Amino acid sequence: MDKNKIMGLTQIEVKERQAKGLVNDFTASASTSTWQIVKRNVFTLFNALNFAIALALAFVQAWSNLVFFAVICFNAFSGIVTELRAKHMVDKLNLMTKEKVKTIRDGQEVALNPEELVLGDVIRLSAGEQIPSDALVLEGFAEVNEAMLTGESDLVQKEVDALLLSGSFLASGAVLAQVHHVGADNYAAKLMLEAKTVKPINSRIMKSLDKLAGFTGKIIIPFGLALLLEALILKGLPLKSSVVNSSTALLGMLPKGIALLTITSLLTAVIKLGLKKVLVQEMYSVETLARVDMLCLDKTGTITQGKMQVEAVLPLTETYGEEVIASILASYIAHSEDKNPTAQAIRKRFVGEVTYPMISNLPFSSDRKWGAMELEGLGTVFLGAPEMLLENEVPEAREALERGSRVLVLALSQEKLDHHKPQKPSDIQALALLEILDPIREGAAETLDYLRSQEVGLKIISGDNPVTVSSIAQKAGFADYNSYVDCSKITDEELVAMAEETAIFGRVSPHQKKLIIQTLKKAGHTTAMTGDGVNDILALREADCSIVMAEGDPATRQIANLVLLNSDFNDVPEILFEGRRVVNNIAHIAPIFLIKTIYSFLLAVICIASALLGRSEWILIFPFIPIQITMIDQFVEGFPPFVLTFERNIKPVEPNFLRRSMLRALPSALMVVFSVLFVKIFGASQGWSEIEISTLLYYLLGSIGFLSVFRACMPFTLWRALLIVWSVGGFLATALFPRIQKLLEISTLTGQTLPVYGAMMLVFTVIFILTSRYQARK
């Protein structure tokens, strides 16, 4: 090998490449840019339609009715500020988890960020690390998982001169490699550039609201023109009045408030979790977490502490005593590049003189469950799971497994090691058993019990022997510890058939972990997966939500939705419940927002239909103006729902968000429609003035909205009672203030309208209580 290559680039060569732009600066970030945040909050369908309506109102100089647009601008500004705060939190936490690349420059090893690499850099990679840039192997041997690029789960062997593809990761082994491509020339970058579709947002709430927005977006222009022409031509109203009335109907149909509150709530959850040392790399995963009903756990580092220690070494033959076994293990582990927790535990225990030089090495693989090394003067040494290397069961191994220990067998063969066709030899001889303990994480039992009490199904998926996993699960208080299967002895078809009913899966390969998750998803479960090793990556990517430990392999942190910076499994319930808080509270207050959407649509249809009847006295003009709706929104849709979204609510999430919310909002919307028709007809028969009719409708509209606020605040607490008093008090104070009355084009309820208001609200309250109780029973 060229010694200059091993020395790496000089600083002069690095600067030359930087000047030419040969830098690895094409990196995908978990955090969006500031410009993307601004675009997402400003350039939306809602804002475009609101802007068009505002232009129409400005054209006719209806300045007082443009207050709604100031609220829209404030909401957009608030969204930007909240999202920037969340971005700052995510960026800050990302710095804590960002993995450096070991790079050789001027003969010295330095740690660089992936984007600091230049063409020709020499990098050192080991098992568990993601490949930051396309590179050619200079030295070493590794097995690489390219599933994230090619979809193939089989490991690909990489020897000298082989090309390592960026975005893949080392499943085993270690190599020295030279950067072959940088930036947009990398294989992973080309895949991103060639992709014609953007990954859809995984949010059922936002998808539901998008459906509603799509419907209103299609009808809003024809409805707007119809309402404008009706008022202008058929009713003969001035242009200003026609624009104002038709604009109100269109504004009411847009469910903008609930969409903004949903995003704000999710961003707030990101910030809250960040303060608890949980990095949320995908905002909408918070909502997905709320819907999780099946949590799949990797045993190591989740239920256990992930702090392996060699408890005992048991020789199995008189030929090789304890001293010889220790010497073999010391040589094996000194030459080994394996850095998994088991290898680290052996390395810590067997530190000594290297007796046997290494000829060749086959790193440990989670697919094979063993590794091997050819040692000079000894033969080929194997280290791995007894059941994967030996034909017959060793009684001592069974006893250790039942104690909850991880058991490895040290074995010897005189056959040559073949990297290309790794298989156990026919002459293999067991030399010793290694019993390795991994203490159970403190509080794991309470956490598992709590999750079960919250209707979250639990499954343990591990590469360990199922007897070991079962024993540990029993100690951790796992109820179904007796329900286990050895996945190394069953077919994929059998695994699919057993996935739903079995609780513990042992000796699972990475492919099988993924298959279990796929099967559970097909059965209708929303799945979450916890893990920390490269053998978990395929399953983590397949799960609806992936949670990894910060102490785990770097490649797992790159693809996870959430990273536990404290690496503490006991944080999982709080993360789950933060998601439930957001989703349940949004579903709880959504009917308050949808009342306006429904009654605006129904009244617009009635107004257009009345124009088609042909009689001018039957023509109904939309009865509200924008400033009235905006003022009521501040006390009904504004402060109360916003405050209620912060309350703790950890009950399981109910399905069919939009359907349930629309049905709960429908009675109130129908009350508004009835109020408009009744007051218009009855008021005309009684000779009421337009200001009296407008005043009564304003009070009825606000009061019907408050019925939904009251329902959302049940059961009452002191804080909720104060919230209602503040909202109702603010509504009445503004409605009774003379200057604001002039702005709202209303007055005070009179001796004629007050009794009608009281009677109607009494009837509406009774109907509201009855319908709410009926819906609650369903």
Predicted regions and their residues:
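Cytosolic catalytic regions of ATP/NTP-dependent phosphoryl-transfer enzymes
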Residues: 291-429, 436, 449-450, 458-470, ...
